[in-house]
């Protein structure tokens, strides 16, 4: 950026020293090319305040010279370099009013106007720097909102996946409950079946014992009693 600012300032000096219309037109074209490069670097790179002030001062001087050139062309006056025009004005003032007091007053007025121009340029540069900071903050806020939107979308997808898994687990739990209930019923029926089978087995055993062992002994005992 420093090289571009130096080129802008050198081009402003060349514009001020231009002695013909063709030369100043060429310098205007070259200045505009350098100006485009400076605008790009100023937009996409971090620039210090003094560099912004130099940039604004060079651009304002270019605008002033361009306006002066257009006024000269519109009025039909010949183009003169800044130094020659100032010397011409001083010579005319010395002829018309050679007093030192008036010259000092006029020089003070000129210096005051330059100081006011510097104040305006400083204010404009500060506003430009503030706008650049606001632009950077807005870009950062947009990036943060985009990141938050991406995180929110990712969280939404995760919640949807968890919801689907929850519904799947709920279906599995419902099916498992039905299976457990049917297994309990099966266990109860099996228990009754086993108990009834065991009871029948005991009955058969008791019947056989009574029929084969107890009854013959009992019948013999009853026969002797008769």
From Swiss-Prot:
Broad class of where this protein is predominantly found: endoplasmic reticulum
GO biological process: intracellular protein transport; retrograde vesicle-mediated transport, Golgi to endoplasmic reticulum
Entry's transmembrane regions: 190-210
InterPro entries listed in its UniProt record: Sec20, Sec20_C
Residues in the Cytoplasmic compartment per record: 1-189
Modified residues (Phosphoserine): 97
Keywords per UniProt: Coiled coil, Endoplasmic reticulum, ER-Golgi transport, Membrane, Phosphoprotein, Protein transport, Transmembrane, Transmembrane helix, Transport
Superkingdom of the organism of origin: Eukaryota
Coiled-coil regions listed: 53-75
Oligomeric form and interacting partners: Component of a SNARE complex consisting of ufe1, sec20, sec22 and use1. Interacts with tip20 through its cytoplasmic domain.
Classification via PANTHER family: BNIP1-RELATED, VESICLE TRANSPORT PROTEIN SEC20
Family: Belongs to the SEC20 family.
Purpose: SNARE required for targeting and fusion of Golgi-derived retrograde transport vesicles with the ER.
Record protein name field: Protein transport protein sec20
UniProt organism field: Schizosaccharomyces pombe (strain 972 / ATCC 24843) (Fission yeast)
Taxonomic path: Eukaryota, Fungi, Dikarya, Ascomycota, Taphrinomycotina
């Amino acid at each position: 950026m420093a090289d571009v600012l130096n080129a802008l300032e050198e081009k402003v000096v060349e514009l001020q020293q231009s002695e013909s219309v063709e030369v100043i037109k060429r310098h205007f074209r070259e200045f505009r090319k350098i100006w485009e490069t400076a605008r790009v670097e100023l937009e996409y790179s971090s620039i210090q305040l003094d560099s912004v002030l130099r940039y604004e001062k060079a651009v304002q001087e270019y605008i002033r010279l361009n306006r002066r050139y257009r006024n000269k062309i519109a009025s039909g006056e010949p183009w003169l370099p800044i130094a020659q025009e100032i010397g011409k004005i001083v010579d005319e003032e010395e002829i018309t009013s050679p007093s030192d007091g008036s010259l000092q007053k006029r020089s003070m007025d000129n210096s005051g106007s330059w100081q006011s121009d510097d104040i305006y340029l400083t204010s404009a540069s500060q506003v430009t720097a503030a706008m650049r900071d606001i632009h950077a903050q807005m870009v950062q806020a947009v990036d943060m909102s985009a990141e938050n939107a991406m995180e929110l979308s990712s969280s939404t997808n995760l919640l949807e996946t968890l919801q689907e898994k929850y519904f799947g687990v709920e279906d599995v739990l419902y099916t498992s409950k039905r299976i457990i209930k049917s297994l309990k019923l099966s266990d109860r029926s099996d228990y009754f079946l086993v108990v009834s089978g065991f009871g029948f087995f005991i009955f058969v055993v008791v019947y056989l014992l009574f029929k084969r062992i107890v009854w013959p002994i009992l019948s013999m005992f009853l026969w002797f009693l008769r």
